[in-house]
Swiss-Prot record:
It comes from the Eukaryota. Its EC number is 2.7.7.13. This is Mannose-1-phosphate guanylyltransferase catalytic subunit beta. Coiled coil: none annotated.
C-alpha cells in the first residue's frame, strides 16, 4: 500500500521554529512530526510514502533518508513548483499512487492515534470511492461540519462554519481513496475539501469514520502545546514506560535520557525535554517543549512556551503565554517574556512584557 502526505507550504504559522527546519521535521514530543505518521503507516503495511513538498525538499530528504532503511519503507518526493492546494498534489503524484490499490492521504500537521487499520477495513466494507476520518469538536461553528448518515457513514454534504447546529463532526485531515479519485483531479491548484469532496458526496461516493481518542492540528504554537498535552496523556494510558517518573516530576512528562535535570526542579505536567538539554536546579516547567541542546538556568519559571534548539535561558527568567523562541536564542538573567516570538540567533537583554515579535 501507499500513502501521500501533504507536506506543502512554508510553515508560517509555526514560525520562528520553521525558519530553521521545515515544519514536518520539527520535533513534536521528541520525534519529528512526520515520523509519528510514517511509523503508524508502516505498522499497517504501507511500503511507500509519497511526500508532496514545495519548501526546502532537500532538508526533508536528508533528514528522512536514514529512516527508509530503519523502518523498511520507501519515501518518494513529489515536488510542486507552484503550490497546488490540497488536491492538486494527488494529480501531480498520480504515477506514484496509481497501482490499483487504495491509498492513504494525510495532512502533515495532524496528531492523533492514527487508526489506519480500522480506516482501511471500514473503507473496504462500504465500497465507496473515498473515506475521511471525522472528529468531534465542542464549537462546530468555527469549522466546516460534515453532515452524514449515522447508520452507514455516507456523507451528504459539508456546511462551512454553520450558524445553526447541523452536527459537531469535522474533517480530521486523514483519508483513504480508491485510485479512481485521480480521474476527478487535475494537476492545478485545487481544494480537496471545497471542490473534490462535495462532488464525491453528490455522487454518493464519500463516507466518514469517526475518530475515537485525541486529535489536534498542531500547525501553530498554541495548538502545538495543546496537542502535546493530549499526546502525552495518551502515552500515559498506552505506553507509560516511555514517560519520566520520580522526584520533581508531575506527569505526564517526556524527557530524553541524554538530558540532565538538576535537583530541586519541578517538571510538569505536559512537558517534553529533548536530547542534550540541561535544566538547572530550582527550575519550574509547565506545559512546555524544550528542544535539543538547550540549557535553562537556575530558578527559572517557564509555562506554555516552546524553546528552540541550542538556546540558553539565564537564571531567574520567567516565560509564559505561548512564547516561542527560535533556534540559538540567548536570554539574559532575570528577564520576563510574555508571549514573545523571538527569531533565531537573537540575544535578549531586556524583558518583553507584552506579546511581540523580536526580529
Amino acid at each position: 500500500m501507499k500513502a501521500l502526505i501533504l507536506v506543502g507550504g512554508f510553515g508560517t504559522r509555526l514560525r520562528p521554529l520553521t525558519l530553521s527546519k521545515p515544519k514536518p521535521i520539527v520535533e513534536f514530543a521528541n520525534k519529528a512530526m512526520i515520523l509519528h505518521q510514517i511509523e503508524a503507516l508502516c505498522k499497517i503495511g504501507v511500503n511507500e510514502v509519497v511526500l508532496a513538498v514545495n519548501y526546502r525538499p532537500q532538508l526533508m530528504s536528508q533528514y528522512l533518508e536514514p529512516y527508509e532503511k530503519k523502518l523498511g519503507i520507501k519515501i518518494s518526493y513529489s515536488h510542486e513548483t507552484v503550490p497546488l492546494g490540497t488536491a492538486g498534489p494527488l494529480a501531480l503524484a498520480r504515477d506514484l499512487l496509481n497501482d490499483g490499490e487504495p491509498f492513504f492521504v494525510l495532512n502533515s500537521d495532524i496528531i492523533c492515534d492514527f487508526p489506519f487499520a480500522d480506516l482501511l477495513a471500514f473503507h473496504k466494507s462500504h465500497g465507496g470511492e473515498g473515506t475521511i476520518m471525522v472528529t468531534k469538536v465542542e464549537e462546530p461553528s468555527k469549522y466546516g461540519v460534515v453532515v452524514y448518515k449515522e447508520e452507514n457513514g455516507q456523507i451528504l454534504k459539508f456546511v462551512e462554519k454553520p450558524q445553526v447546529y447541523v452536527g459537531n463532526k469535522i474533517n480530521a485531515g486523514v483519508y483513504i481513496f480508491n485510485p479512481t479519485i485521480l480521474d476527478r483531479i487535475q494537476p492545478k491548484p485545487t481544494s480537496i475539501e471545497k471542490e473534490i469532496f462535495p462532488a464525491m458526496a453528490a455522487d454518493s461516493q464519500l463516507y466518514c469514520m469517526q475518530l475515537e481518542g485525541f486529535w489536534m492540528d498542531v500547525g501553530q504554537p498554541k495548538d502545538f502545546l495543546s496537542g502535546m498535552g493530549l499526546y502525552l496523556n495518551s502515552l500515559k494510558s498506552k505506553q507509560p514506560e516511555l514517560l519520566a517518573t520520580g522526584n520533581g516530576i508531575i506527569g505526564p512528562v517526556l524527557i530524553d535520557p541524554s538530558s540532565v535535570i538538576e535537583p530541586g526542579c519541578l517538571i510538569g505536567p505536559n512537558v517534553t525535554i529533548g536530547p542534550n538539554c540541561v535544566i538547572q536546579e530550582g527550575t519550574r516547567l509547565v506545559n512546555t517543549t524544550v528542544l535539543e541542546g538547550t540549557t535553562i538556568g537556575k530558578n527559572s519559571w517557564i509555562k506554555s512556551t516552546i524553546i528552540g534548539w541550542n538556546s540558553s535561558i539565564g537564571k531567574w527568567v520567567r516565560m509564559e503565554n505561548t512564547s516561542v523562541l527560535g533556534e540559538d536564542v540567548h536570554v539574559s538573567d532575570e528577564l520576563y517574556i510574555n508571549g514573545g516570538k523571538i527569531l533565531p540567533h537573537k540575544s535578549i537583554t531586556s524583558s518583553i512584557p507584552e506579546p511581540e515579535i523580536i526580529m
